[in-house]
């Protein structure tokens, strides 16, 4: 079975290396970006099953990345974009959902095991949506 491709866009080196290691150990292929500009360039190439996007980053924040994708979609379709943030109940999160983010994970609250569970859930859901003709008719 082909490994799911994850793009991790995270400027904090410790968090980025931790998430990379945890996800690789769980059987995912992980590419990383160190800031929003680097992340946007990789997202535009496309082909990722899931994108984990930090909100607060230098050069270009997560919301600016999401806005750019609305104006210039990727060459190859990507799976869902899930925010990585330490913000909870914040207007920034609502704004991100309005810009097509599919979820958010609070970095300070999530354990490595929970991260893997969430990533599996998002990658499985996106595969179901793409490959299942039932998904369209049953969405409520």
List each language-model region with its residue ranges.
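Charged docking surfaces used in two-component/phosphorelay signaling
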Residues: 17-25
């Amino acid at each position: 079975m082909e490994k799911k491709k994850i793009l991790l866009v995270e400027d904090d080196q410790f968090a980025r290396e931790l998430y990379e290691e945890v996800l690789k150990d769980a059987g995912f292929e992980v590419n990383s970006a160190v800031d929003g500009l680097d992340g946007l360039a990789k997202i535009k190439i496309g082909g990722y099953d899931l994108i984990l996007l930090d909100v607060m980053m230098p050069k270009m924040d997560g919301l600016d990345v999401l806005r750019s994708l609305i104006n210039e979609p990727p060459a190859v379709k990507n799976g869902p974009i899930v925010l990585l943030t330490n913000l909870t109940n914040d207007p920034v999160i609502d704004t991100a959902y309005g810009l097509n983010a599919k979820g958010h994970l609070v970095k300070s609250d999530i354990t490595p095991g929970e991260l893997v569970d969430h990533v599996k859930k998002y990658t499985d859901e996106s595969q179901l949506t793409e490959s299942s003709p039932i998904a369209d008719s049953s969405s409520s």
